[in-house]
């Protein structure tokens, strides 16, 4: 049974029905429509916490999807799952792939920075200050890119950049 038929949430189900109608009416090819169905089912599974099913659907969507922006969104969602499962290196790799498809994804950069900053704190707590500084610098690098793409969208990151002395004046313009 398609995932859309199992969704009990009225708003989600309404959205799914509307999206399905739009996809049926739009003049897009069958391959793109099928990719969308896999993506939609992956998103639904991800929202339900069924990450294995979500990843399976996202993998199928990637096999069919040709649009780089849509591929990037699918990869970003996969990376979010890897990140939440503690597969941080795999998440970083997948965020990079998403950015190759669409470099205008500040949320990918933000999430990569969260991982680097976490690794920096772990290294710092372990007394490895040089390693910590390298991770913090990597976090600052990707976060600076994220802030440039989305000025004012990540105030917590802007504050971290300023408070750690890793801020550039031009970041905010």
Swiss-Prot record:
Membrane-topology annotation of the record: Peripheral membrane protein
InterPro entries, per database record: PSI_Ycf3_assembly, TPR-like_helical_dom_sf, TPR_rpt, Ycf3/AcsC/BcsC/TPR_MFPF
Q: Name one Pfam family in it.
A: TPR_12
UniProt entry keywords in alphabetical sequence: Membrane, Photosynthesis, Repeat, Thylakoid, TPR repeat
* Compartments in which it is found: Cellular thylakoid membrane
> What biological function has been recorded for the protein in this entry?
Essential for the assembly of the photosystem I (PSI) complex. May act as a chaperone-like factor to guide the assembly of the PSI subunits.
Q: Which family does it belong to?
A: Belongs to the Ycf3 family.
For this entry, the protein name equals Photosystem I assembly protein Ycf3
